[in-house]
């Protein structure tokens, strides 16, 4: 790879091949214990061929290599930060890159404040002196802040208030069909979710079309596959039909004629997530599954991801999601379905293990023949759909709203946003 010359880090040092090499090597270091340190474990070595040339040597053919480089995990950090950050916690609260804004302050519970980078490589950018993000969980509060001018942009515009926001002449609403999958994992290490009939019953018990209306006000669509249709090699397999009678029959066949008790967690506690959790809880109750529901705070999710012994994992039913930021089928599924990616490695909260699925993941990732790769991903998705480690819920839309004077603040299909050229136009 040939690097752009003259690019400076936020600390004033030059981005060169040695900096790129260090960023990837330390990012993948087992000592640092970053959550996604395995993101580039297919790289054999990285070399600085000259000051502005970086050479990657891979362990084997890897068809999604360029897509992986597009992920934020591959962002190049300042050597000075990497050398002093001895833990992943240090990296979580500090930032030093080459982007248009520099980090001033970050407190996850309060705010994220950045200021203009005067050395940004694009002349005339960025336009703002500073940007401030504030976490606001409650939907109506978030909308009110935008309407009163306290905020100029809101991510996750409240779906139930979109008609009101659209009617406000001072605002703009943006809705993007996303690559975000919402699903409910079932811990397959624990009874009764080790029984495929129980997992199938859970899928039949939930009316996905009604869920889209009740929790998302129509700004979602029932999941009709393992990954959204925008992802290459996605296969339409459903959605699972709503059939509570079939669900009760399957529970009876599995040995649970009167249902059972369990726990239902939501990984998020915003208004839409809580509505989703409550709706699913009610649907399950109608077929005899009595679930004690709880929406987790951000810190409580460590209970799931920090657990190192799969046999002691506390989650049973767990509503979460996955956003495929690389728009590649491998990263769209592997983190949550590959057997080696169980917490705390990555996001296989179902503790799903299927050797045939693992083999297909590896074959498809290495196969350079597009037709063979498509066939392998098709078979893989069909197996996952049949095994049903999840209740496949919805593909949600990404919604945002902004003051009409705020331009070039763009919402992306993976739920993130791009604001490099954002400006205020009167």
In which residue ranges do the predicted regions lie?
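Aromatic- and charge-enriched surface segment that lines or borders ligand/interaction sites
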Residues: 1-33, 49, 55-57, 145, ...
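Short, solvent-exposed loop/beta-turn-alpha elements that line the ligand-binding surface or hinge
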Residues: 29, 72-98, 103-105, 120-127, ...
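Bilobed periplasmic-binding protein-like "clamshell/Venus-flytrap" ligand-binding domains
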Residues: 63-69, 97, 213, 253-272, ...
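Short, well-ordered beta-strand elements
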Residues: 1, 20-24, 54-56, 99-102, ...
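Surface-exposed binding/hinge segments that line
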Residues: 2, 37-82, 105
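Ligand/substrate-recognition segments at binding pockets and active sites
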Residues: 108, 139, 155, 252-324, ...
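Ligand-site clamp/hinge motif
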Residues: 3-4, 118-164, 290
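Append "and occasionally in soluble cytosolic enzymes with long acidic Gly/Pro-rich linkers
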Residues: 113-116, 122, 167, 174, ...
């Amino acid at each position: 790879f040939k690097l752009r010359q003259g690019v400076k880090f936020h600390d004033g040092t030059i981005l060169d091949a040695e900096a790129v090499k260090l960023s990837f090597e330390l990012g993948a270091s087992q000592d640092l214990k970053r959550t996604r340190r395995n993101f580039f474990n297919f790289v054999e070595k990285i070399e600085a061929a000259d000051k502005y040339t970086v050479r990657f040597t891979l362990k084997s053919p890897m068809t999604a290599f360029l897509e992986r480089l597009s992920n934020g995990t591959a962002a190049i950090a300042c050597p000075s930060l990497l050398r002093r950050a001895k833990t992943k916690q240090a990296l979580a609260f500090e930032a030093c890159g080459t982007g248009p804004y520099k980090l001033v302050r970050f407190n996850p519970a309060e705010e994220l404040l950045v200021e203009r980078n005067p050395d940004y490589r694009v002349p005339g950018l960025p336009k703002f002196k500073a940007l401030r993000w504030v976490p606001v969980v409650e939907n109506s509060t978030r909308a009110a802040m935008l309407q009163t001018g306290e905020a100029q942009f809101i991510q996750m515009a409240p779906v139930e208030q979109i008609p009101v926001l659209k009617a406000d002449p001072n605002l703009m609403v943006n809705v993007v069909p996303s690559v975000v999958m919402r699903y409910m994992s079932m811990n397959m290490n624990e009874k009764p979710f080790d029984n495929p009939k129980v997992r199938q019953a859970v899928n039949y018990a939930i009316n996905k079309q009604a869920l889209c209306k009740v929790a998302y006000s129509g700004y979602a669509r029932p999941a009709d596959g393992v990954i959204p249709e925008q992802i290459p090699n996605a296969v339409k397999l459903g959605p699972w039909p709503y059939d509570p009678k079939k669900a009760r029959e399957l529970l009876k066949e599995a040995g649970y004629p009167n249902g059972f008790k369990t726990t239902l967690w939501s990984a998020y506690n915003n208004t839409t997530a809580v509505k989703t959790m409550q709706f699913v809880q009610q649907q399950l109750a109608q077929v005899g599954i009595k679930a004690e529901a709880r929406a987790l705070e951000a810190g409580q999710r460590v209970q799931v991801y920090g657990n190192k012994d799969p046999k002691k994992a506390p989650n049973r039913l767990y509503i979460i999601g996955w956003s495929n930021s690389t728009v590649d089928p491998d990263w769209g599924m592997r983190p949550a379905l590959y057997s080696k990616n169980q917490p705390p490695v990555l996001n296989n909260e179902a503790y799903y293990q299927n050797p045939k699925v693992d083999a297909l993941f590896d074959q498809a990732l290495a196969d350079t023949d597009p037709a063979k790769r498509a066939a392998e991903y098709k078979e893989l998705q069909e197996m996952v759909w049949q095994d049903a480690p999840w209740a496949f819920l919805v593909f949600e839309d990404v919604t945002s709203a902004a003051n009409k004077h705020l331009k070039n603040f763009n919402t992306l299909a993976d739920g993130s946003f791009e604001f490099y050229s954002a400006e205020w136009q009167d």
